[in-house]
């Protein structure tokens, strides 16, 4: 997540990452303090199960995880490829970057990778975008589906406890 602004979205995304085993990368500056009650409440009691890494800036993130050397995609309403048209099944590690709720990803980043690494979720042309946490969940579960939900429990035993 690049410069997220809404604490509840980040909490929901943290919960999705924790329950799926995905690593959450937070790129600063954040629009809130990560210890805020709204963030913690949205993530429930999953915070101690979350693999999280924070980065000082988008530049610091891209320097560490180079797009050309990694399976990296940029989720945007301006994307050229549907997220379902990517074959993730042969990718061991996948990075999907999402921008801030009000502006999305930086324009310079989209211009650089628009034709090669941008993905989008199809939607009606008359509306702006889905909620960020919903978008993260949709794309995360497509990647997991293509990996046959590896390491995830497909039937519930929660009620048996």
Residue ranges and their predicted role:
Residues 1-161:
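Post-transcriptional modification and biogenesis factors for structured RNAs
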